[in-house]
C-alpha cells in the first residue's frame, strides 16, 4: 500500500449540509481536493465516506496526516512547504504509535477505527464499496484452457456458417431471440446516468441483443432504444405497472446479486429527484427503500401467480429468476417450481453500485464453480429447456467462450459494458463522483 501524498499544509473550509454524504480523499492524489476523484486507484488508499453531522462550514484535512479524518486536527503544523507533493506516512501522535496495515495484519487500522468511532462514520452496515470483489482475489478464468479440434474432432473451415443466436425461454409462447449469446445485465437508472443507460441500450440494439432494466424501474428512453428489453422486478417493485408488460420482451424476478443479497437497499432522499423519482414511482425527496425480500410472496406458487399474469398481459414472454450464487441447487429448484423459463446466476465477483463490504467480500460462490454446479443440476433434472445465463466478473471474449464451454447458454455483461462506454474502473460508483460521468447524476 502506498503512503498518502501531502496535498497542502493547511486545511480547507467547505460548506456541508447535514446528512450530506461525501467522500474525503485519503491518498492526496485527487485533483478535486478535499474530495475523491478516483485517483486512488492502485494505492490501496480508498476514500473515506462520511456524513455531515450539521449544516455549516467544516475544515477538512489536506495534509492527510490527521488522526481525526476527514477533519483537520492540527497535524499540518509539523509539516513544511517542502513536504507538499511528497508521500508521507501518517505519524500519529506522541502518545501512541499509529496503526499501519501490513500483509501480516491487514485489518489493524480498521479495528482501531471501529474501536475509536464505532459505526458513527461508516453507517450501520459498515464500510460501503462499489463494483464486485476484485478479480485478483477470485478464481481466474485464465486458468481454464480450451481443448480445440484437430483430428478426432475435425475443425470447421473458415467459410462454414456458425450459429450465434441465443433463444431465451424456448418453451415460452414468445421466446426472445438474441443475435449473440451476450446481453447487458441489470444496472438501474439512478445507479447509472440516463445517458449511460441509453448508450448501452442503443449499442445492444445495434449488436442485435438486449438490455435489462435493473431494479430501479423502466427508463422510457432506454426501452425505446432497444427491442429486446428485459424487465427486472425486485422487492421494492419500483415503477412496476402491469400495462408496461406489453412493452417488454422478457421479465425476471430479482432474488439477489453476487455482491449483495438478503439485505435490501437504500437510495437517499436527496438522490430521489426528477426523472429518477418518476421512473421509480416515488415522490421526490423521499428515501427509496428496497426491503430484504418480497413482501407477501413466499412460495413458488406466489411467484408463479405473478409470472402467469405477466405472460397473460404480454402474450407469453419468457419469465426468469435472477439468483445470487449461494444455495444454488435449492434456489434453482424454487425457480423451476415457480415456472422459470430462464435463470440468471450471479456469482462472487458480480458488481453493484453500492454494497456493504461485509456482504460484498463475504458472500456468494465464485462464478466458475457456481456455473458448473448450476449446469450439472439442470442436466440432472433434464431441464435443458431452461435457459441458463451466467454473470459476475466476466470481462473478455475469452471469458465468455469459456463460460459457454462450461455450460452457460449466455452471458450477461455489466462492468465490461460500462467500460466500453468509458468507465475507467475507479471503483467509486457509490460516491456520485464517477470521473467518467457514467455513475453520476449531476
Predicted regions and their residues:
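N-terminal pre-ligand scaffold of iron-sulfur
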Residues: 1-34, 38-60, 83-85
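Mobile "lid/hinge" segments at catalytic clefts and subdomain interfaces of large enzymes
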Residues: 247, 252-254, 259-282, 417, ...
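Hydrophobic residues within beta-strands of alpha/beta enzymes
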Residues: 211-212, 251, 343, 411
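Short flanking/linker segments adjacent to small metal-binding domains or redox-active Cys/His motifs
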Residues: 70-89
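Glycine-rich phosphate/ribose-binding loops and adjacent secondary-structure elements
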Residues: 291-442
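Conserved, well-structured core domains of diverse proteins
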Residues: 88-182, 186-205, 209-210, 217-218, ...
Amino acid at each position: 500500500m502506498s503512503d498518502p501524498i501531502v496535498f497542502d499544509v493547511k486545511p480547507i473550509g467547505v460548506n456541508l449540509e447535514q446528512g450530506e454524504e461525501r467522500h474525503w480523499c485519503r491518498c492526496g492524489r485527487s485533483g478535486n481536493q478535499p474530495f475523491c476523484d478516483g485517483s486512488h486507484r492502485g494505492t490501496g488508499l480508498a476514500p473515506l465516506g462520511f456524513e455531515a453531522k450539521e449544516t455549516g462550514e467544516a475544515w477538512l484535512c489536506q495534509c492527510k496526516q490527521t488522526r481525526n479524518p476527514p477533519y483537520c486536527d492540527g497535524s499540518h503544523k509539523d509539516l513544511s512547504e517542502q513536504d507538499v507533493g511528497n508521500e508521507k506516512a501518517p505519524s500519529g501522535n506522541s502518545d501512541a504509535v499509529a496503526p499501519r496495515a501490513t500483509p501480516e495484519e491487514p485489518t489493524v487500522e480498521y479495528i482501531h477505527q471501529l474501536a475509536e468511532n464505532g459505526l458513527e462514520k461508516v453507517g450501520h452496515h459498515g464500510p460501503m464499496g462499489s463494483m464486485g470483489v476484485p478479480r485478483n482475489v477470485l478464481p481466474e478464468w485464465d486458468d481454464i484452457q480450451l481443448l480445440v479440434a484437430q483430428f478426432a474432432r475435425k475443425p470447421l473451415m473458415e467459410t462454414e456458417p456458425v450459429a450465434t443466436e441465443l433463444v431465451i425461454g424456448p418453451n415460452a409462447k414468445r421466446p426472445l431471440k438474441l443475435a449473440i449469446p451476450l446481453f447487458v445485465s441489470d444496472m438501474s437508472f439512478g445507479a447509472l446516468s440516463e445517458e449511460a443507460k441509453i448508450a448501452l441500450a442503443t449499442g445492444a440494439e445495434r449488436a442485435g441483443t438486449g438490455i435489462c432494466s435493473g431494479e430501479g424501474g423502466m427508463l422510457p428512453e432506454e426501452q425505446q432504444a432497444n427491442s429486446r428489453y428485459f424487465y427486472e422486478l425486485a422487492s421494492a417493485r419500483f415503477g412496476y405497472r402491469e400495462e408496461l408488460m406489453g412493452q417488454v420482451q422478457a421479465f425476471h424476478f430479482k432474488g439477489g446479486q453476487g455482491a449483495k443479497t438478503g439485505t435490501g437497499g437504500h437510495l437517499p432522499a436527496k438522490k430521489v429527484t426528477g426523472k429518477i423519482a418518476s421512473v421509480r414511482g416515488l415522490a421526490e425527496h423521499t428515501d427509496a427503500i428496497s426491503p430484504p425480500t418480497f413482501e407477501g410472496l413466499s412460495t413458488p406458487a406466489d411467484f408463479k401467480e405473478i409470472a402467469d399474469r405477466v405472460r397473460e398481459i404480454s402474450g407469453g414472454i419468457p419469465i426468469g429468476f435472477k439468483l445470487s450464487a449461494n444455495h444454488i441447487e435449492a434456489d434453482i429448484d424454487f425457480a423451476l417450481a415457480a415456472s422459470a423459463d430462464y435463470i440468471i446466476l450471479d456469482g462472487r465477483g458480480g458488481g453493484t453500485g453500492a454494497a456493504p463490504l461485509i456482504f460484498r467480500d463475504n458472500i456468494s460462490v465464485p462464478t466458475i464453480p457456481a456455473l458448473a454446479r448450476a449446469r450439472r443440476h439442470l442436466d440432472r433434472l433434464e431441464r435443458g429447456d431452461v435457459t441458463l445465463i451466467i454473470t459476475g466478473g466476466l470481462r473478455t471474449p475469452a471469458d465468455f467462450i469459456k463460460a459457454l464451454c462450461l455450460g452457460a447458454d449466455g452471458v450477461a455483461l455489466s462492468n465490461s459494458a460500462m467500460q466500453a462506454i468509458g468507465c475507467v474502473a475507479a471503483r467509486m460508483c457509490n460516491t456520485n463522483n464517477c470521473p467518467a460521468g457514467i455513475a453520476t447524476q449531476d
